[in-house]
A protein has these predicted regions:
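Generic non-transmembrane alpha-helical segments
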Residues: 16, 20-24, 70-74
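C-terminal edge and immediately downstream basic/flexible tail or linker adjoining helix-turn-helix-like DNA-binding
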Residues: 48, 64-82
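Residues within the DNA-recognition helix of helix-turn-helix
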Residues: 59-62
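Acidic, proline/glycine-rich intrinsically disordered inter-domain spacer in sigma factors
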Residues: 1-19
């Protein structure tokens, strides 16, 4: 068992982020995850997905916008534990 209360907060926050990611449209989530988790550039993602870099930029910006709205209530928690 973990005794650090921050562990449970981080675990809950991670779960909420994962749930929010799953609710994104597939095209937004794919571009976002390739950029943020696979560290691919917009150009690399564009080549991989066979779309323009502008389309990749749009999809990632939309994903961020939706995630900000969805996770806005958790920002104070995140800031408190950092």
């Amino acid at each position: 068992e973990y005794e650090d209360p921050d562990f449970y907060i981080v675990e809950e926050l991670s779960r909420k982020i994962e749930e929010a990611l799953q609710r994104l449209p597939d095209s937004y989530r794919e571009a976002f995850e390739l950029n943020r988790f696979q560290h691919m550039t917009y150009g690399e993602i564009a080549t991989c997905l066979e779309v323009s870099s502008k389309t990749v930029d749009y999809r990632i910006q939309q994903a961020l916008k939706l995630l900000r709205v969805e996770l806005k209530d958790y920002l104070p928690i995140l800031l408190a534990i950092l």
